[in-house]
């Protein structure tokens, strides 16, 4: 008798971002205790740290708060601007010491690294040119490889680079160049399905072309009926978020089931974190969306698992 086949699967978690949390402290945002309670009620076991300072930063307190709810931590997040020059190293490493230092004590093995935006997500002010020159690209790549190497050596943490709307690495061509100029031993991708689709990226093709560079997933969908207006009228990403550019599944692109299945075939230890950008929403809105999104994902594919 042949052995039954097992469908490869990956862990599905969520993040403060799906509750509208972008900043450590903001009166518009849901209190952190309520966030954790609603995560549990939504059926998730894995979360990201979110902005440093939103959840408790004392490792013992955070471990108690998560453990009492049966929750576990998959990653933290830092922001970098290596294309600006060597002076950016201290800023990046100071963040890493705090954030990687915290999450590693709770068993997390990943750090999601987001590049500085050329347009402010707080004020929508244009801060710098939209594209990088060759020298800036070289600084960007070298900085991330240095960071990834240091994270591995100091904390056993893997760097997962997150391309982003309104950043210098967003389009397919830009992501491909970033991969070509960085070392996969130290720098790989947190593939955010919504941000990559924001500029027309084909998530499945990227996964197929670069399976060894996919280290982490953020699951979200972009509303294409709104996207073309956003791009045509040069609407800042932060403003587009308030218009629900990142839409509740299944009302956008890409289809999440095929993405999850493709990544599960690469490595069943990869995390897929649901991350629907909702900053500025009412505090009562995220919870029902989180429940429906989880139900949608688990109804769409057998390659999703809770733990």
Placement of each model-derived feature along the sequence:
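N-terminal pre-domain/capping segments
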Residues: 1-110, 134, 138, 145-146, ...
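Active-site acidic/histidine proton-transfer and metal-coordination neighborhood
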Residues: 3, 88-189, 285
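Acidic/histidine-rich catalytic cores of soluble enzymes
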Residues: 9, 14, 46-47, 141-253, ...
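Acidic-and-aromatic substrate-binding clefts and catalytic sites of carbohydrate-active enzymes
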Residues: 23-27, 46-61, 81-92, 165-171, ...
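Short, flexible, mixed-charge acidic loops at enzyme active sites
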Residues: 26-31, 117-126, 226-239
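Residues at the N-termini of beta-strands
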Residues: 46, 110, 216, 270-271
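A short, acidic, amphipathic alpha-helical segment used as a generic capping/interface helix at domain edges
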Residues: 250-265
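Short acidic/histidine-rich active-site segments
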Residues: 273-279
């Amino acid at each position: 008798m042949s052995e039954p086949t097992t469908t490869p699967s990956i862990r599905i978690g969520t993040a403060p971002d799906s509750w509208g949390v972008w900043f450590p402290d903001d009166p518009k945002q849901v209190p952190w205790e309520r966030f954790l309670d609603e995560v549990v009620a939504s059926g998730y076991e894995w979360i990201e740290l979110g902005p440093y300072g939103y959840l408790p930063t004392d490792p013992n307190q955070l471990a108690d708060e998560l453990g009492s709810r049966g929750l576990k931590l998959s990653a933290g997040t830092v922001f970098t601007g290596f294309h600006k020059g060597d002076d950016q190293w201290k800023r990046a490493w100071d963040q890493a010491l705090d954030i990687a230092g915290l999450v590693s004590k709770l068993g997390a093995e990943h750090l999601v690294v987001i590049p500085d935006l050329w347009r402010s997500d707080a004020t929508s002010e244009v801060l710098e040119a939209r594209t990088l020159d060759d020298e800036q690209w070289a600084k960007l790549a070298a900085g991330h490889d240095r960071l990834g190497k240091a994270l591995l050596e100091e904390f056993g943490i893997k760097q997962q680079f997150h391309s982003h709307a309104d950043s210098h690495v967003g389009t397919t061509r830009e992501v491909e160049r970033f991969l070509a100029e960085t070392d996969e031993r130290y720098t790989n991708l947190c593939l955010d399905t919504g941000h990559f689709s924001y500029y027309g990226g084909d998530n499945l093709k990227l996964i197929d072309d670069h399976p060894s560079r996919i280290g982490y997933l953020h699951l979200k969908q972009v509303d294409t009926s709104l996207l073309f207006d956003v791009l045509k009228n040069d609407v800042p990403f932060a403003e587009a978020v308030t218009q629900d550019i990142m839409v509740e599944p299944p009302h956008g692109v890409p289809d999440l089931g095929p993405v999850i299945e493709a990544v599960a075939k690469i490595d069943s230890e990869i995390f897929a974190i649901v991350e629907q950008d909702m900053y500025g929403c009412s505090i009562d809105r995220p919870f029902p969306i989180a429940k429906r999104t989880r139900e949608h994902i688990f109804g769409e594919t057998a390659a999703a698992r809770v733990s």
